[in-house]
């Protein structure tokens, strides 16, 4: 893959930033795309901008604010409290489907075949569009829809959060990911608020990894 180019679906969070570091080692040229979909915190987009600039990665921002007109969830609605149901109310219907579809359109225009996303089935938090089955199905659909050989790369698919921290460390990005990324649903950079489901998952993985880190 060293002579190929890739587009990373990028939010500025732990997972997508780890994927960005991974992609920079795997591909000859990497760009990133971030989607503005009416998320609770503009900070997510600002963090993504800053990280892309610091890593010298060309960065695109696409407006998908129409998602807020179609679905009600705790990631786009400030008046909804975050819950932990079987499918949490932080799940945005169609989000990864749309993100990857728009990323594919952009990738084709840029002459790229690889699309990198940080979805993960091991710690998928009840989100159906993070499952390997969905990604493989969408990959086939996109190839047929655009008659173009896309490859959706999912380097975190079978890693839990402990293993994701280990990968960041292998990539030389452990401290950067720990201090600079925004995973928190409440918009707190780095270690986060410590209370939301995303922060708890991130911290549990970090604690588990630091216990065995050499």
Swiss-Prot record:
GO terms for biological process: queuosine biosynthetic process. Pfam families: QueC. The keyword Zinc applies. Homodimer. Keywords: ATP-binding, Ligase, Metal-binding, Nucleotide-binding, Queuosine biosynthesis, Zinc. Zn(2+) binds at residues 184, 193, 196, 199. It is an enzyme of class 6 (ligase). SUPFAM superfamilies: Adenine nucleotide alpha hydrolases-like. GO terms for molecular function: ATP binding; ligase activity, forming carbon-nitrogen bonds; zinc ion binding. It comes from Exiguobacterium sp. (strain ATCC BAA-1283 / AT1b). Its cofactor is Zn(2+). Catalyzes the ATP-dependent conversion of 7-carboxy-7-deazaguanine (CDG) to 7-cyano-7-deazaguanine (preQ(0)). The gene is queC. Belongs to the QueC family. This is 7-cyano-7-deazaguanine synthase.
